[in-house]
Amino acid sequence: KTLMEYYGVKYYVATGEADHLIAHLVKSKKVWGCLSDDMDMFVYGCTRVYRHISLLNHTVIYYDTTAILHDLEMTFDEFCEIMVMSGTDYNIHNNTSIHETIKIFTQYKKYMKNKKNKKMSFHLWVSQNTEYIPDYDEFLNHYKIFKLDKFEEPVVNNISFKYEPIQRDKLQEFLTNYGFIFCSS
């Protein structure tokens, strides 16, 4: 925090889960995207996610969720259902995998293509036609974690992203404590 303050960078401490705050900022277009290696950011609804940043190689991988969904020919809800079924930070001990979930999703798509009533969600179809989800209520509880319809974070309304000036003297003094050496000018 001190380093960011001396560099003039704004930061906010979420009262709850930081992922919720970040996703809300992205979805409300207060920020353009998020930098996180946490795959859950996709399920929270972040439309632009940067992952695997390398300061050494000057690289980062950019994911555009809208383009991904278009390429995969699936809705955001289907995408979320697949991700939650395959395992998140909240249900990592499930005996599921992304590969198996995609196989089942392909079966679901074939089934729905031939069905007149196309209102059945993927997760409901899975619970009625397979034994892939052993505890449907538990799945629904995990799935609901990612629905941020009623996000309440008091700081969000007052967030300002105006950078402050760099405090060079304080920054230099701070970094010297960590072994950085500076030339006098």
What annotation goes with each model-predicted range?
Residues 1-17, 21-25:
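Noncatalytic, basic helical substrate-engagement surface that gates or grips nucleic-acid strands
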Residues 10, 49-53, 101, 142-145:
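Generic preference for hydrophobic/aromatic residues in regular secondary structure cores
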